[in-house]
Amino acid sequence: STLFPYTTLFRSDIGCISEAHHYAKEVATGHLPFLLTSCCPSWSVMAKKYFPAMIDNISQELTPMVATARIVKKEHPHAKVVFIGPCASKKLEAMRHSVRSDVDFVITFEELWGLFDAKSITPSTCEELPEETQAATAAGRGYAIAGGVAGAIENCLKEYYPDVPVHIEHAESLAECKKVLTLAKAGKIKNCMIEGMACPGGCIGGAGTNAGFAKTSKALKKYVDGSEPKLPSQELENLELN
């Protein structure tokens, strides 16, 4: 069998440029009072469960995991797709009827480390696979930290829609997310993009991580700061991944 490594970062780039377009088209024109991000499955599930009237305000953009999986299945129809990351909630997302044919398995970093340990595999001694050819921008690479999605969308709006006023809110932890949604429901937060992340600190603070937040956030910042270009091309909003 052949292993094809893919990252979800390029799909994050597509997502942030599409979200910026959606914000400019729907929120800035008053068609929607606010727009909720959808890349964190726990956040979107909570919003749908406790605030069902807001379902139409949740972005319809595919999550980076699903978008990547669909590209893999298109390029390699018989491939088995395994998503590896710090998020335990991705396991439930992969079980959805609309997703289960795209993502075959989900394992966390912690589980992967356990597999390495059980099989006496030392990653540093293994042959490196070639990186995916489509590199991500700093915007896509910053998705994993709280405020990263909102920040990427905000920067895209300022670059490509300079005449559109930008109002961004973000919350981390489900308790804070619920507070923000309660305020939005009451009309106290409006005309904005709202990013929600279930895990404090964002994805890098996920339940399945195998490293401390201080270490991972520092590494991510270095990774983002060293990335070029900083923003995805506006042309990406025309890509169809559905």
Task: Annotate each predicted stretch with a short phrase.
Residues 1, 5-242:
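Iron-sulfur-associated redox domains of electron-transfer enzymes in respiratory
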